[in-house]
């Protein structure tokens, strides 16, 4: 021991000391010197290496260390990072399924498209191009056209068949249109005859229709309906309107046309509307009192 010198231990005040050491993913050293000054990371690393400070290095994944640290605070938890094995494709692909059986064992004709009636002729041969097939009269659809015509024909007299019933309907429409452009007659003798002698029932329908039309025209001219069909009751009685009715609109001056004047001597009021003239005449007869202006004292 005599001449051996003991290793010199640096003074506590002169040597810097470490206050904390932590790492997460990469090392970081926080060093304070004797003057309580912070060192930058580069100087701190050099100081740590010079004093041979052992670093806590780990070759494991930092995330696994964090999970292990969190498991300590959660009782009964078992969080592990493990790669799940790849599932085989047989589990991902759908399995084979049996064909869905229909509700009906024997499907109807509308289910099987091969049994549908052909709306248009086939074009395989030239002879079948011009052939028209009536799908309304087919057996599958029950013959809708023939049944409707037979139902109408059953309600007609025995002497009229289905074809004559269709002719009567078209003739009635023609007669109704002719009534719209001609004046109503008292009897059906002056109506142009468009029916044959065999259609006796059609003649009775035409005669009843003409009587209803003539009765409607007679009631409308009398003005007994809800709305008057004639404007004779609203005709103006002013002198200008009397002249136009007597001599015609071309016989009087153009300035008097459409103008209604008062016939009271000394008045001379002129209005563009007959309703205004009638209101003025009520003032002459005393039915309507004259409104006084605010400035008039009398």
Swiss-Prot record:
SS bonds (residue pairs): none
Source domain of life: Eukaryota
Null allele phenotype: RNAi-mediated knockdown abolishes expression of sulfotransferase ssu-1 and thioredoxin trx-1 in the ASJ sensory neurons, in adults, embryos and larvae.
Keywords in alphabetical order: Metal-binding, Transcription, Transcription regulation, Zinc, Zinc-finger
Signal peptide: none
Function: Probable transcription factor which modulates gene expression, thereby acting as an ASJ sensory neuron terminal selector gene.
Protein name per the record: Specificity protein transcription factor 1
Gene symbol of the encoding locus: sptf-1
């Amino acid at each position: 021991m005599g001449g051996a010198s003991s290793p010199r231990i640096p003074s506590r005040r002169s040597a810097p000391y470490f206050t904390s050491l932590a790492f997460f993913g990469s090392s970081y050293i926080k060093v304070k010197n004797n003057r309580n000054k912070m060192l930058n990371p580069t100087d701190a690393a050099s100081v740590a290496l010079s004093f041979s400070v052992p670093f806590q290095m780990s070759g494991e994944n930092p995330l696994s260390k964090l999970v292990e640290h969190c498991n300590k605070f959660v009782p009964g938890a078992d969080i592990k990072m493990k790669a799940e094995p790849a599932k085989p494709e047989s589990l991902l692909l759908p399995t084979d399924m049996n064909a869905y059986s229909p509700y009906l064992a024997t499907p109807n004709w509308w289910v099987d498209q091969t049994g549908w009636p052909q709306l248009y002729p086939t074009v395989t041969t030239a002879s079948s191009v011009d052939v028209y097939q009536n799908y309304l009269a087919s057996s599958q659809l029950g013959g809708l056209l023939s049944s409707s015509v037979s139902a109408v024909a059953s309600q007609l007299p025995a002497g009229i068949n289905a074809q004559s019933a269709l002719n009567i309907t078209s003739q009635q429409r023609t007669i109704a249109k002719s009534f719209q452009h001609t004046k109503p007659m008292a009897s059906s003798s002056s109506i142009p005859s468009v029916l044959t002698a065999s259609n006796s029932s059609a003649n009775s329908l035409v005669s009843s229709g003409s009587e209803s039309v003539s009765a409607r025209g007679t009631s409308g001219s009398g003005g007994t309906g809800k709305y008057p069909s004639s404007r004779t009751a609203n005709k103006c009685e002013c002198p200008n309107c009397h002249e136009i009715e007597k001599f015609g609109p071309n016989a009087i001056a153009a300035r008097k046309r459409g103008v209604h004047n008062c016939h009271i001597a000394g008045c001379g009021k002129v209005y563009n509307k007959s309703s205004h003239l009638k209101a003025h005449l009520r003032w002459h007869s005393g039915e309507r009192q004259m409104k006084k202006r605010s400035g008039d004292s009398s």
